[in-house]
Regions:
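Short, solvent-exposed recognition patches
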Residues: 43-149
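Charge-rich, low-complexity N-terminal segments
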Residues: 1-73
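Generic hydrophobic secondary-structure signal
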Residues: 11-21, 28-29, 66, 98-100, ...
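A short, solvent-exposed beta-edge/loop patch
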Residues: 129-185
Length: 185
């Protein structure tokens, strides 16, 4: 009986010793192997917007008078028939895209295109379904919510052109951003 107690005691002591060594190793490993998030690099979106306004067949919109702390993170204009950055299929129409990060680190996207509005709306809204009415770019349009309920979009159409403001945000935040949109030029 005494031998069993001694053997069990040795096993317990060995497990405690292993735990004492293992926990600091795990903590040190976690501390030194974390990859910090890369800093957000602001971009100058105005030249892209000016080019889009000069070449697109629709009225190009962009935000004006955004409060301090907003950072542009994406600006792209792809003329119809040209491949997007990184190759791939050519854009079906003139496509303008802007992305901004708010001071609260929330991403707002502005997308415009003048061809195949149904396919464009489906892609940008993440296969969203209509969810009432809202305003985008000074125009009344439709609200869309993605299948998973996470992404909301405001869609305004003018003929074959579509303007979409989207983000993983409440409609009120999207409408506030959309209210800053004005024609470029």
């Amino acid at each position: 009986m005494a031998t069993t107690k001694k053997r069990n005691s040795s096993v317990v002591h060995m497990l405690v010793a292993m735990l004492v060594l293992f926990v600091p190793v795990v903590l040190v490993t976690q501390l030194f192997t974390r990859n910090p998030e890369p800093p957000i690099t602001p971009i100058d979106w105005q030249p892209v917007a000016q080019r889009a306004a000069a070449e697109a067949s629709y009225e190009v919109l962009a935000p004006t008078n955004l409060p301090e702390g907003w950072v542009a993170t994406r600006a792209r204009f792809t003329p119809g028939g040209q491949s997007t950055t990184g190759g791939g299929d050519p854009a079906p129409g003139d496509t303008f895209q802007l992305g901004f990060l708010s001071p609260e680190q929330r991403y707002f996207a502005l997308d415009q295109r003048d061809v195949a509005p149904e396919a464009f709306v489906t892609a940008v809204t993440r296969t969203g379904r209509p969810d009432g009415e809202g305003a985008a770019g000074g125009r009344t349009g439709a609200r869309y919510v993605s299948e998973d309920g996470r992404t909301r979009s405001l869609v305004a159409r003018d003929g074959d052109a579509a303007t979409i403001v989207s983000g993983d945000l409440p409609y009120e935040a999207l409408e506030a951003f959309a209210s800053t949109l004005a024609p470029v030029g």
